[in-house]
Amino acid sequence: MGDFGMSGDDLEQMYQEVILEAARDPHGREHFATDVSKEQGSAPADTTVRASHEYCTPGESHQFNPTCGDEATVHAEVSDSEPHTIERLVWDGHGCSISQASLSVMVDLCAGKTVDEAMELFRDFHELMESRGAGLQDEAKEEKLEDAVVFQGVSKYPMRIKC
């Protein structure tokens, strides 16, 4: 099952298509105003906010990979009422095609989901990235990951996982 029902060549072709699509039309990418975090009531842009979803507020996470220079800021807004839906999910940044494509796929996958659903997707994606190319061995999880499953190939290269 770890190949999402595809041959290695099919998965590689799908990977290339997802990367190229994200390069042409990166979903959720916005150029942030320098003070967007203050306007939205969240932490400064150079701060990573880490809070469990029980404290639903707008938040940002800024990440920098010093080994390759990838840099991204993700801004999320979550509804105050149950079931705490991700109402807005945008990002800005620069880096390699893998980092840019993964941000674009994340927006497609998580926007509009509940925080609990997004956290489940995060756990499944994290498991995929730790698989060293073997995949999840669970077709239902792979189907939920949609286009994100193409990053299975990246999991073969530990230095690229942070991308």
List each model region and its residues.
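Alpha-helical support elements that line or immediately flank enzyme active sites
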Residues: 102-115
